[in-house]
Amino acid sequence: MFIVVEGGEGAGKTQFIQALSKRLIEEGREIVTTREPGGCSLGDSVRGLLLDPEQKISPYAELLLFLAARAQHIQEKIIPALKSGKTVISDRFHDSTIVYQGIAGGLGESFVTNLCYHVVGDKPFLPDITFLLDIPAREGLLRKARQKHLDKFEQKPQIFHQSVREGFLALAEKAPDRYKVLDALLPTEASVDQALLQIRALI
């Protein structure tokens, strides 16, 4: 099973994934957790470039770097893990690119979606289920402000992050069978309980 966790800045994805993984392992599943950009040596190298506020990368170059990292990530890590019977949980995937670069970034939703869906061939490589940790942009940014160092995207203005939130919710509305929206203001364990119900329904 391939699970993706999406959400805006400060939604608590890392904590949610850790808690969800722990519960699934307790149920006897083999879990592989990963993230984007990252998840492989190429992805980790690209991550540093993409998130560095000092790097001046054009929007199209940024998009293609995300896609290059994803293509390698899918082939090197995700597909082999799935073929071996493991459950893969990824912190971000296609929809983050569609929202951050396509919608909030202005490159166009349909244009970016088309590129994402053809990154490893003619057929879209999609998760079995996507959990969206939804949080108001202002609250998410307040959480992030407590950190010492913010990356390039975390430093963007609130209007950008509001567009990100609206973009994710719009994608969730278009794909209700794949998307499950969780309230990121709830305690993590409450969200994990809801997620486990959805995962068990797919088994």
From Swiss-Prot:
Top-level class of the enzyme under EC nomenclature: transferase
Entry-linked PROSITE patterns: THYMIDYLATE_KINASE (PS01331)
Catalytic activity, as annotated: dTMP + ATP = dTDP + ADP
Residues noted as binding ATP in the record, renumbered to the chain: 7-14
Cell cycle is among the record's keywords: no
Keywords: ATP-binding, Kinase, Nucleotide biosynthesis, Nucleotide-binding, Transferase
Enzyme Commission code: 2.7.4.9
One Pfam family named in its UniProt record: Thymidylate_kin
Any single biological process term in GO: dTTP biosynthetic process
SUPFAM superfamilies for the chain: P-loop containing nucleoside triphosphate hydrolases
Keyword rRNA processing attributed: no
GO molecular function, one term: dTMP kinase activity
One GO CC term on file: cytosol
InterPro entries from the UniProt entry: P-loop_NTPase, Thymidylate_kin-like_dom, Thymidylate_kin_CS, Thymidylate_kinase
Protein family membership: Belongs to the thymidylate kinase family.
Protein role: Phosphorylation of dTMP to form dTDP in both de novo and salvage pathways of dTTP synthesis.
Family annotation (PANTHER family): THYMIDYLATE KINASE, UMP-CMP KINASE 2, MITOCHONDRIAL
Alphabetical list of HAMAP family matching this protein: Thymidylate_kinase
UniProt protein name: Thymidylate kinase
Source species: Chlamydia trachomatis serovar A (strain ATCC VR-571B / DSM 19440 / HAR-13)
Lineage, top ranks: Bacteria, Pseudomonadati, Chlamydiota, Chlamydiia, Chlamydiales
